[in-house]
Curated annotation (Swiss-Prot):
The gene is THBD. Interacts with ITGAL, ITGAM and ITGB2. Interacts with thrombin/F2; this interaction switches the specificity of thrombin from a procoagulant to an anticoagulant and antifibrinolytic protease. Interacts with ANGP1 and ANGP2; these interactions significantly inhibit the generation of activated PC and TAFIa/CPB2 by the thrombin/thrombomodulin complex. Interacts with PF4; this interaction enhances generation of activated protein C. Interacts with HMGB1; this interaction inhibits HMGB1 inflammatory activity. Residues 1-16 form the signal peptide. It is found in: Membrane. Residues 17-518 are extracellular. This is Thrombomodulin. It comes from Canis lupus familiaris. Disulfide bonds join 137-158, 246-257, 253-266, 268-281, 289-297, 293-309, 311-324, 330-341, 337-350, 352-363, 370-379, 375-389, 391-405, 409-414, 418-426, 428-440, 446-455, 451-464, 466-480.
Length: 578
């Protein structure tokens, strides 16, 4: 967080340019081992998620009404005007449907699961425009709530900016707030300011995660929340030995804290002594007790010199009451694991059957990456989260829209795509013409004079090799953009405008004056053939009127008519093919 704040201050000073305001932390709340923080400032879902992860957490998961109450507390402490705040719920693919997908409507938490006992959607039903589709993310807001004080969920485009976001942090151990004597606090004006590992500061916390610090004024005492090695609970302390002011957390003393001699100091019972930290007490036999026990030794204060051995979690005391042996956690009933349990020394591991994966101590089936895909033909998974669309034989994905398929041919001739219910209805790829009814033949653009100079015909397309008079001399293009050079070098003659050089990477539009296109030639050929047929019919009619012999007329006119199959062609210029 410090790095983010420094960048926000130094960047405008170094460049002299205004920079967008970074989201700022506002109110925070902690409950046992979980903490939550509200950030205000415009941010997309991705930017919000990255900010939370950079602080060691993730966007908030609202799985219960308790978590929803935390959001209400954070909003009440923020004092905003119904902001929209990102939470950790997203729909990567498919469409949101209130009738399917369970209470989350097909959405998933950023932790990769969809477990929840709570949902609060602002839109209970699908609108007239139909359900919104992925990618979608969820923002929570008071403005969308059906009732005051009950923030509701709204689907939003993930690329849109919300007014802020909510982060969630989990810690293995936590400390309660410092205990301060009320009378002493009122007399000396004692105040405590807490700082958390995720950057939250304040004086009102229900719990503080391990790694937090506390500044106690006016004594100048700095305390840290830490879990001692081998203990599950954290407590307040400091590196410097000795007690601090007795009005704050009993001065840190294990037993009694006394300030009668002026400076605060810790006192121990008569049968114990003060240890090196100046706050803990130990019995006189404790210095040799740890050598007798394998893990822990607890002196018995009621019987001087006696002790009790204890073991770490996952172990149990052996028959000799001194050694510790491993406990097989996997034989417990009910089982600690949902499917498979593997015992280890002092612990255990949970595994799943093949085809399942472990998510938050539950075995779930992996989500099919093809679920909700929009592939026109077939979807093929390539990993647990990604897929690709494939097409039928003779087709290939559209480059700019890989979910759709288009006809594809890399040869001079390929079978046409014909409707089985209408055999005469056939289609060919761009750059091909239907031939013999069921075959697509490549159009040789080079024979039609598409290039002013050298030409190379390719399946479905062509290339022009530009000459020295072209702005693209020596390059390959579909239009070399021929220019007229001035042999006299007279800069005053001509139109007075400099020659236009085509922009690299953009194909110039074909000149309206140039070689006749192949479509025009085909149209002329068909028109000529039609004219010949008409002339033959006219000739037969004239000969019949002149009384020509019937046999000759039958020979000329009674013969079976030859079927002429005409293929519809377009006379406009052929677009360039990919």
């Amino acid at each position: 967080m410090l790095r983010v704040l420094l960048l926000g201050v130094l960047a405008p000073a170094g460049l002299g340019l205004p920079t967008p305001a970074q989201p700022q932390p506002r109110s925070s709340q902690c409950m046992e081992h979980d903490c939550f923080q509200l950030f205000r400032g415009p941010a997309t879902f991705l930017a919000a998620s990255q900010t939370c992860e950079g602080l060691g957490g993730h966007l908030m998961t609202v799985r219960s009404s308790v978590a929803a109450d935390v959001i209400s507390l954070l909003l009440s402490g923020d004092g905003g005007d119904g902001p929209r705040l990102w939470i950790g719920l997203q729909l990567r693919r498919g469409c949101s449907d209130p009738g399917q997908g369970g209470p989350l409507r097909g959405f998933q938490w950023v932790t990769g699961d969809n477990r929840t006992s709570y949902s609060r959607w602002a839109r209970p039903h699908v609108g007239p425009a139909g359900p919104p589709c992925a990618p979608l993310c969820v923002a929570v807001s008071d403005a969308a709530a059906p009732a005051p004080g009950e923030p509701a969920w709204e689907e939003q485009r993930c690329a849109a900016e919300a007014d802020g976001f909510l982060c969630e942090f989990h810690f293995a151990a936590s400390c309660r707030p410092l205990l301060v004597d009320a009378r002493a606090a009122a007399a000396a004006g004692v105040s405590v300011t807490y700082s958390t590992p995720f950057g939250a500061r304040g004086a009102d916390f229900q719990a503080l995660p391990a790694g937090s610090s506390a500044a106690v004024a006016p004594f100048g005492v700095q305390l840290a929340c830490a879990a001692p090695r081998g203990e599950a609970e954290a407590r307040w302390g400091r590196e410097a030995p000795g007690a601090w002011d007795c009005s704050v957390e009993n001065g840190g003393c294990q037993r009694a804290c006394s300030a009668s001699a002026g400076a605060p100091r810790c006192l121990c019972p008569a049968d114990t002594y003060l240890q090196a930290d100046g706050r803990s007490c130990a019995t006189f036999a404790e210095h040799s007790c740890h050598k007798l026990c394998e893990h822990f030794c607890i002196p018995n204060a009621s019987v001087p010199g006696s002790y009790l051995c204890m073991c770490e979690t996952g172990y149990q005391l052996a028959a000799d009451q001194h050694r510790c042996e491993d406990v097989d956690d996997c034989i417990q009933v009910p089982s600690l694991c949902p499917q498979l349990c593997v015992n280890t020394r002092g612990a255990f591991e949970c595994h799943c059957y093949p085809g399942y994966e472990l998510v938050d101590n539950e075995c779930v089936e992996p989500v099919d990456p093809c679920f909700g895909s929009k592939c026109e033909y077939q979807c093929q998974p390539v990993s647990q989260t990604d897929y690709r669309c494939i097409c039928a034989e003779g087709f290939a994905p559209v480059p700019h829209d890989p979910h759709r398929c288009q006809m594809f041919c890399n040869q001079t001739a390929c079978p046409a795509d014909c409707d089985p219910n209408s055999p005469t209805s056939c289609q060919c790829p761009e750059g091909y013409i239907l031939d013999d009814g069921f075959m697509c033949t490549d159009i040789d653009e080079c024979e039609n004079g598409e290039c002013p100079e050298a030409c190379r015909n390719l399946p479905g397309t062509y290339e022009c090799i530009c000459g020295p008079d072209s702005p693209l001399a020596g390059q390959v293009a579909t239009d070399c953009g021929r220019i007229i050079s001035d042999p006299d070098g007279d800069s005053d003659s001509g139109s007075g405008e400099p020659p236009v050089t085509p922009t690299p990477g953009v194909t110039p539009s074909p000149s309206p004056v140039g070689p006749v296109h192949s479509g025009v030639l085909i149209g002329i050929s068909i028109a000529s053939l039609s004219l010949v047929v008409a002339l033959l019919a006219l000739l037969c009619h004239l000969r019949k009127k002149q009384g020509a012999p019937r046999a000759e007329l039958e020979y000329k006119c009674g013969a079976p008519a030859k079927e002429v199959v005409l293929q519809h062609v377009r006379t406009e210029q052929m677009p360039q093919k990919l």
